[in-house]
Amino acid sequence: TPSDLFRDWEDRFYIADSGNNRIVVTDSGFSKATRIYDKLKTADGETTLKDPEGIYVSEETQCMYIADTGNSRLLVCDLDGNVQLELTRPDSTLYENETFKPQKVVVDKAGNIYMVLNNITNGSAMFNSDGEFQGYFGANSVDATAEVVANYFWNMIATDEMRANSSRNVA
């Protein structure tokens, strides 16, 4: 089952095929698979993917970034399938969740890695190019003030007409 798709600078498509535990590379017309990554080389042998849900390929680093969801990790591999870096659950006070399930991944030109993680609402988890957890990027928390709670309650009981006539306050 395809769960993500990435088009590279040479018009190749990388497909995260989560149902078959692999990354499939096709030509620009999707007419043939030019490469299948189902086993990746590690320093001590090889590893397999399990339910990969995200793929990103960087022209700058010539690496694939694979959200290997079922194995609770993100793999950084060269285009020959050699694992360069493995990111797992951060050992940080900022990361409070028990699980680490990367679903989608992107990388900026500086090499920073941004991951959407299952059950994380703090934003995208950000790692530097060395794999060190930097915190979250994107979402800010909303303090549950009396006004926020009152607005939430009001929206639960208000009719569509009442909501249409009300104004929205953004601080």
What is the predicted role of each segment?
Residues T1-A171:
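Eukaryotic scaffold repeat domains enriched in small/polar residues
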